[in-house]
Amino acid sequence: LKPRFRIAVIGAGRAGRLHAVNASQSISSAELSCIVEADPEVGNKVGDELGVPAFTDLEQALAGAAFDGVVIATPTFTHAQLAVLAAGAGKHVFCEKPMALTLDECDEMSLAADEAGVVFEVGFVRRFQPEFVEAKSRIEAGEIGRPMLVKSLTRGPGLPPPWAHELHRSNGMLAEVNSHDFDCVRWLTGSEIERVFAETANFKGAERGVTAPDYYDNAVVTLRFVSGALGTIDGTCPADYGYDARVEVLGTEGLLVVGQNQATSLLKIRARGAGEVPTYVSWSQRFEAGYRGELASFVKTALAGAVPEVGAADGRAAVAAVRASNRSWLEGRPVLVASESVA
């Protein structure tokens, strides 16, 4: 029997627990080695549930457990330090999006992985969700011609965690919610984003007790791609009707719509799962297959010593687009993504 790839999951919140369950139960070539969680009560609960030890920091785990790779599912402002430490210890790294807060951090993480000779993969789940994969394949096959216009949206039903309310600790909702969109439109169009113009609004923050400056719960970004294509990204969090993720690509010869679940031309949706058509109640339900697929891809890539499907350059590109969009709405002007080359 081939040895299984041993994984330490860092962060036992919603995403971390999902990755831990998948590593433990859904990927035959992998096994869960341990949980790393700063809150010992949370870490021990997940560890006990899955039958593995829990540690309160990565240094303890490196000293006390054997593993081949890590999954980083902690707040964004901790990603760089953890990734550099793990890579320096010779561990392969799967990092949840957003990759980091700044491009300098992205570069540090990428360099650490390169110098250590380990795989570094970023968790852009849509690249592994079957309907998105099929859309990419059809676009590459030329079924709709050359992409001209792309529209992508993500709406989440709950408030982000408190640390994500603060722009300087998270880069805001455009990072926490819409990083997926920035990556997805690059991937589907096959082109880098050249210029962005963003507008934001705050409709629900005050009534839900959010006091952080520069907080917003709605955003729209218009895009121009290097290829000449145009696009829009929008995000809302919280969107009380449920979790929603869709993309539309208009080409010179046709249209692809991914994630549409509407049976009527006029539709009203209010409560999660109780409207005129069913809605997804959470991101984990919407992308269940994708989360299994991305972790399986990481394991396969690490075992083979291959190039990851979604690497550090992809994570960096999304961070650059997010930061340019934040500069755009803060300064009220279009911003070239290349101007964020160092920040």
Q: Predicted regions span which residues?
A:
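Predominantly a Rossmann-like dinucleotide-binding segment in NAD(P)-dependent oxidoreductases
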Residues: 126-213, 332
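Hydrophobic residues in well-ordered beta-strands that form the structural core
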Residues: 56, 72, 94-95, 120-122, ...
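C-terminal helix-rich "cap/oligomerization" subdomain common to oxidoreductases
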Residues: 1, 69-72, 226, 300-343
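N-terminal Rossmann-like dinucleotide-binding module
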Residues: 1-50
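Rossmann-fold dehydrogenase core element
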Residues: 108-125, 145-152
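Contiguous beta-strand/loop segments that form the cofactor/metal-binding neighborhood of enzyme cores
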Residues: 182-263, 292-305, 342-343
